[in-house]
């Protein structure tokens, strides 16, 4: 880890998944979490690592009823010269 360590607790809005069909809402919610974190931490989506607790929170009520928002604790740091974001539920 380097000196550049940025940790934030943020709320990820997931209301946009309601536009998806019921069978794809939880899948879309997971990709929305990843893209939201990538945008706010200025990294590519491939550099975002999601903890299984996020997956469990999204899928808790099934595929068709993900939460409308999700509190996430995310940290950005440098690993092997590249920026990486790790996230878990807050």
Curated annotation (Swiss-Prot):
SUPFAM superfamilies: Ribosomal protein L31e
GO cellular component annotations of the record: cytosolic large ribosomal subunit
Coiled-coil boundaries: none
Entry similarity comment: Belongs to the eukaryotic ribosomal protein eL31 family.
PANTHER family for the chain: 60S RIBOSOMAL PROTEIN L31 (PTHR10956:SF0)
GO BP: cytoplasmic translation
Cross-referenced InterPro entries: Ribosomal_eL31, Ribosomal_eL31_CS, Ribosomal_eL31_dom_sf
Listed name of the protein: Large ribosomal subunit protein eL31
Gene it is expressed from: rpl31e
Disulfide bonds: none
SMART domains associated with the record: Ribosomal_L31e
Pfam family name, one: Ribosomal_L31e
UniProtKB keywords: Ribonucleoprotein, Ribosomal protein
MF (Gene Ontology): structural constituent of ribosome
């Amino acid at each position: 880890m380097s000196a550049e360590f940025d940790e934030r607790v943020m709320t990820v809005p997931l209301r946009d998944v309601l536009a998806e069909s019921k069978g794809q809402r939880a899948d879309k919610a997971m990709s929305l979490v990843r893209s939201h974190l990538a945008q706010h931490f200025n990294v590519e989506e491939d550099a975002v690592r999601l903890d299984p607790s996020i997956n469990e929170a999204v899928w808790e009520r099934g595929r068709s009823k993900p939460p409308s928002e999700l509190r996430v604790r995310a940290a950005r740091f440098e690993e092997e010269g590249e920026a990486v974001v790790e996230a878990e539920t807050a």
